[in-house]
Amino acid sequence: MIDFLEGEFFKRTEKTQSLMYEKGLDAILLCTEAEIRYYTGFRSLFWQSPTRPWYVIIPKNGKPIAIIPEIGRELMERTWLDEVITWPSPRREDDGISLLVEALKKSKTIGLLMGEEATLRMPLGDFYILESRITGSFVDCSQLVKEVRLVKSEAEIEVIKQICNVADCAFDRADKLFHVGQPLNEAFRDFKIALLEEGAEEVPYLVGGAGQDGYSDVISPPSRQTLKTGDILMLDTGSTLKGYFCDFDRNWAIGKASDAAKLAYSKLFKSTEIALQEIRPGMTCEQVFLMINKSLGDSCSDIGRMGHGLGIQLTEYPSLMLSDQTVLVENMIITIEPSLAYGDGLMMVHEENICIRDGKPELLTKRAAEELPVLI
């Protein structure tokens, strides 16, 4: 089941513990799926059930400690961890809290994710009980964990390359998948099937839009509206392999493309090309945002950001936006995602996935066509 060699998880933990030492942390408490998977290799769709809480403690030294429901024991014991503590869950009177208290009894300063994009995946009432029963105190460790996850290993990069290639192959089948008269929900279904046939393990994210000359919404579930000549169809997928995401989209014109749609597509292609040529380590996310924004001119949309981190989550820290001063470093993986508004309430988006390297970034996706493709 383990997706990486043990050394991968050891390095992640070792780097985290080094930063913990610098920050004076005795332990870190994790309770969210992405972080627990990142440090342990525990991957399961059972997280779709909100009933049971799951915990992992990263101590100052040694391997992480799992404190989890009994139902997850066998899978967790296949990971690199040595200590897996379980209880019969759900158990309303004590759903793992006493075990956490015991495990944290010697820790004075305990890190907990409290910052942007963080959630507390345990009952708030149980957290208050835990807080009252331990001698230590909780402090925010969000930035510490983000700093570790920000830079990908070559093993992680290789998996993301593979899932990008899977999606590329599915997108390349567009001329055989989409046609005039096809209900949009069937187009989505057929594309999802293509992704699975090409090798995706899961397709947890597939959104898009379609409409005459363009679309006005890119996050709704597909309706039964049929594709018509002159429609612009966009599909955006976050498919996964070994729990790692790709995240990019492609646009097509159905039958024919209007001048407005072709111009919008051309602007986005050129804007993305500027980013692909100019991005370098040492630039800040804000600088990249401003570069893309400037290239789009007055056509820029108000979505708020022009890309984001990518990895074991569909969207990760950081964001290519104003005020994000995160510095790009080698082996970060980010999306380049310019968008623009045009016509009467229409929009268009364009997305590629890249890895920051010494010099020009490495393009992980197959570059979109230079001109808006027309499906006949």
Regions inferred by a protein language model and the residue ranges of each:
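Active-site neighborhoods and metal-handling regions in enzymes and metal-associated proteins
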Residues: 1-376
